[in-house]
Amino acid sequence: MARIPLEFLSITLPVLLLAYCLAIEYEVSLPTIAHTSPASNPEEYLQSIYEQLNLDLPSTCTVNHLSAFDNTPTSLLNFSTSPVEHFDAPKLPSGLNATAGEQWAFDGTSSSGRSGLLLGIYRDASYAFLGPGNFRLSLDLVWDNSTTWSTVDYLSSSTVHTCTDKVVGIWSHSADHYYVFTVTADAKHARIHFHTPDVVGAVDLYSTTPARYPDGALFPSEVSVTQNAPMLHWVEPIPGGLIDVDLKVKDTPFRWTGLGGHERWWSAKGWLDLMTHWEAVRLMAGPYVLSFWQPTSRVNGVAYPSAFLTKYGEKVFSAVSGKVSEVEDYILYSPVRMEKQARETGYEVELVSPAQGRRWVFGLEYRNQEFEFELGDAAGGRAYVGRAKGGEVHADDKPEEPSEGVFFIEHVDVKALTVPRAYVVVSFEFGPPIHGADIWVAC
């Protein structure tokens, strides 16, 4: 459901440490970063984007526009914790500082259980020391034949329109290079447009579930909270629904339908400062939709599970505990391994409600890996798509006729990883330039 492009750090950090040592050894003078400039005036190309997509945005919409290299605010940020504000409205509207950030995320799994999509759209200064600015987009794709493709794109501007009937977000670099998402006020429909040199097309997501808070309460609720773990806020505008993907990636078709979902995160610090691990599952099997998110806090070492199950679009279960209880609803989440295999081949998810006297069990079998990255010291992450099967198990241990479907799952371990705090800028050739910028890397 969520990914930060940590593998980028696994490449840059060793290089940067070497550059730093060489600079110290030979007393090299280190230049400053040359910031990337947009291809044209944002006001001009934004108008072109509105016209291309026939976006009719009334003047009553609240417009929040930020640039990738805006100065860091020195005063306290406006950090929204309102439980009744539109989930997709900006939570840091006054700007970003060196730590706080927010993310809009979308994911999908094909009905075959073999293709998948994971999209993260960020306003986040966590990687500002790398130089390309505060607005990035990560996209991971896997085709039925196991081919994968990933990109991290840095944009020049971010504009979010909050209207009475929808929220529209535009991450752009020019009239020919942009991403646009639209989410309706009732969170029943989301659409993402892609228009870049590499990816063109659109993704539509139709919710079959109610928007929800970390505690499982349904939106809107004036008494619920958006905080999921210390300094981390998370809500689900679309816990699950039907997705229609119609993209072309470097002229290769990427088209399918299946399961999709949409998440929102915002936090007072970067993810590496706040979490050591996180797990995520989204599943659709027959009438059931399950969403599960569990971060483990670096602040106190505690895991914060949030499980939510619907049947025919109605909530039947939620839990914020991962421990067996005779009173409290809980989720058990365990890997399945074949004999003599070090890695799991799937997972089993068990949901138990002692108060209702009900239990649901779902088996998840991996079909394709969507991404994997290793960062050393046991740090890294993996995501899979696959087939799901399960349903309710009655008191006599006789399960209902099992339902079949698909899932997305993600595991990330960054316990041994931290973002460096001493930043040094070096200038040498490293990979392709970003939007025509000078070649540089920053630590």
Curated annotation (Swiss-Prot):
<feature type="glycosylation site" description="N-linked (GlcNAc...) asparagine">
    <location>
        <position position="145"/>
    </location>
</feature>
<keyword id="KW-0732">Signal</keyword>
<keyword id="KW-0413">Isomerase</keyword>
<comment type="pathway">
    <text>Secondary metabolite biosynthesis.</text>
</comment>
<comment type="function">
    <text>Diels-Alderase; part of the gene cluster that mediates the biosynthesis of oxaleimides, cytotoxic compounds containing an unusual disubstituted succinimide moiety. The first step of the pathway is provided by the HR-PKS poxF that serves in a new mode of collaborative biosynthesis with the PKS-NRPS poxE, by providing the olefin containing amino acid substrate via the synthesis of an ACP-bound dec-4-enoate.</text>
</comment>
<dbReference type="Pfam" id="PF24137">
    <property type="entry name" value="DA_N"/>
</dbReference>
<dbReference type="InterPro" id="IPR054499">
    <property type="entry name" value="DA_C"/>
</dbReference>
<dbReference type="Pfam" id="PF22903">
    <property type="entry name" value="DA_C"/>
</dbReference>
<feature type="glycosylation site" description="N-linked (GlcNAc...) asparagine">
    <location>
        <position position="78"/>
    </location>
</feature>
<keyword id="KW-0325">Glycoprotein</keyword>
<comment type="similarity">
    <text>Belongs to the Diels-Alderase family.</text>
</comment>
<feature type="glycosylation site" description="N-linked (GlcNAc...) asparagine">
    <location>
        <position position="97"/>
    </location>
</feature>
<dbReference type="GO" id="GO:0016853">
    <property type="term" value="F:isomerase activity"/>
</dbReference>
<feature type="signal peptide">
    <location>
        <begin position="1"/>
        <end position="23"/>
    </location>
</feature>
<protein>
    <recommendedName>
        <fullName>Diels-Alderase poxQ</fullName>
        <ecNumber>5.5.1.-</ecNumber>
    </recommendedName>
</protein>
